[in-house]
Structures are given as structure tokens and as C-alpha cells.
Amino acid sequence: MSVNSWIKALVDAIRAAVVRRQTNADRPTTTEADDRAYVQNLYRVVLQREPAETEIAHWVAILRRGGSDREVFNRILTSGEYKARNKILPGHPIGHYYSPIVDPDEARKYARIDYGISPEKILGVRISLSEMQEVWGRLSAFVKSSDFPMNKESRCRYYAINEIFPIGDAAILRAMILLNKPHRIIEIGSGFSSACMLDTLDEAQMADTRLTFIEPDPQRLRELLRRSDAKRCTLIEKPVQAVDPRIFEELQQNDILFIDSTHVMKTGSDVNFELFQALPRLRQGVLIHFHDIQYPFEYPNEWVYNRKYSWNEIYGLRAFLMYNSDFAIEFFNSLFIGRHRDLIEKTYAPILKNPGASIWIRKLRQ
């Protein structure tokens, strides 16, 4: 619900309460069903949720004993739950020019996105398809040998039919690990990508590679891990912003920093921390992955207009890379796969079912 709609609904609820008081001054002349509906509507409008049956019964009992509508309304409006919700309401409504939430009408008017733009026309960012072709030459044998199960199987932690980390991303991740043979991987935002990493390390018998997962909500990760994984995995169960940034200085050449976090830049966000604290601390030769980065550094219309995503990480990363000779784009999934579909089909056709949205960057200089 937008802020404007929320305010309108709140005003309507207040007016409804006033009408009830004016027309039912001698309480109670309404039915129990009326009182029940009144309580449900208050919860939906003021607290933005459905009330539990015990909550409905509590407030209906007060109303049936002669309690006023205003009393119930005011008690809900001054509750700790409402105050907790109210403190995070935006200072400016959706659609206001100060709001970071995407206004679809404004986006359609000004975005003018050319998804087929040539890489050399993206100003300030060096994107070399010929260099990606060379990287593909080193990756392709590993990609070709991919054997991901489509559905959950006991032999693997990862399976391709999931809504989080598609097969195209998994195939390139596996190939990057097999090519670079990292001794250490730090992952920010864990789950199916972690499963792919562990399957790959098992396959390559890379028992000495250590993984650190930074994940404040690790339920999905725990469901995918095996008991034996604890020997080489460290789980930091907190937001990356709460982690000592010196941990990123421990990564060495060909080690991997894998980022798949909230995709949102804002005051105190994980994406800000990653761009401003983690990346500058990396040593030369470290390989960096960002997920959900689509070419040409724009989000698909489906994400913006239908799913209503107001992500902005992609623009922060683009700005970070502009005129930045300390980092280089090594591989850009959506760009390369989109331009070389015939090559991908000959190498490992399942990628074309869902190419994914990964970008791989390398730190060139300290």
C-alpha cells in the first residue's frame, strides 16, 4: 500500500469510527458481527495485518461491554506495534521527487533504456567482449562438463530449478572456481550459490578451500548444508555491516568475494558497506562477483514495472566502475550469453533456459 493510500484508508477508518459514535451514542446498538468487522478493518488499516482470533475476541468484548469505538481506535493507534511501524514510514510519499521508490510513470518517461546498446557506448565503463571471449576460452571446458541436477537429489546440494540462483549463474560460478582454484571464499548472502560452491569443491577435491558465509538469515543455507560442511565453513550470522571489514584483507590472489545481498543502496545499507569498505580493502588479483546485475547496468522491465523492485545496486556498481582502472570486468553473464547464444548452446545448452545475472570483476591494483 502506498503512503497516500494508507493515509486515505486511515482517514476513512477515523470517519467510520466517528459515524459509529454519532449514530450509536447509547452503545451497543451494533451487532457482534459489526464489531468484529470494525476490529478487523482497524487492524488491516492501522497495523497492516490480519488480527488473530484472540485479538478480535479481546476488542469485541470491550465493545460489547459498552467500550467506545474511539477508545479501541486510540488504544490501537497508541500501541507499541503501531509506533514501531510508524517510525519507518517514509518522510515523503511514493511518487514524491524525494522518494527513492521507483515511480513507473516517471521511469517510463525518462529511462529510455536501450537493452541492446553496444558495450563501447556505455560511457566511462570499460567492457571488452574480446577479453571476455578469452576468459570464455579458459572457462568453456569446465562449463561443458557441468552436470547439475534439475531437481533435488542426494548427490548434490545444489539443484537448478530454484527461484534464487539459476543454472546459468551456477555454471559460470562452478567454472570460475575450477579455473581459479581459490583457497578462500567469502560470501555475502548465502543459499543456493553456497550449495553450488560446496558441490564444486567436493567434485574437484579442493578440501583445503575455506568458506566464510556472512548471512543474517541462514535458514535456507542450513537446509542445504551437510553436517560434514562444518569442517571448512564459517557462518557469521549477522549483517555484513556489523562485520569487521578487515576480514576482506585476508583474501589473496584468485580468492573470491561473492556478493548477493539486498541490492539496495541507502544510509547504513549492506551495499554501501560492500562498495565503500569491502572492495577498497581487497588485494590485487581477488575475484569479485555481484549477483542480479543485468546488462547494460539496468534492471529488466519485468523487475521494475511488474515486480515493483526499486533496487539501485546496479547503478552504484556502474558508478564505481566508471573511470576506475583498479578493477576490470572479467565476465558479464547476461551480455556474453546474450551475444553468443550459438556458442553457449554448443557448450552447455541448459544455460539458455535461465542465463542468470552475474558479473565478475577482478581487482587489478592494490
Say what each PLM segment does.
Residues 11, 27, 83-289, 293-366:
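A short alpha-helical cap/connector motif
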Residues 5-87:
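Substrate/cofactor-recognition hotspot
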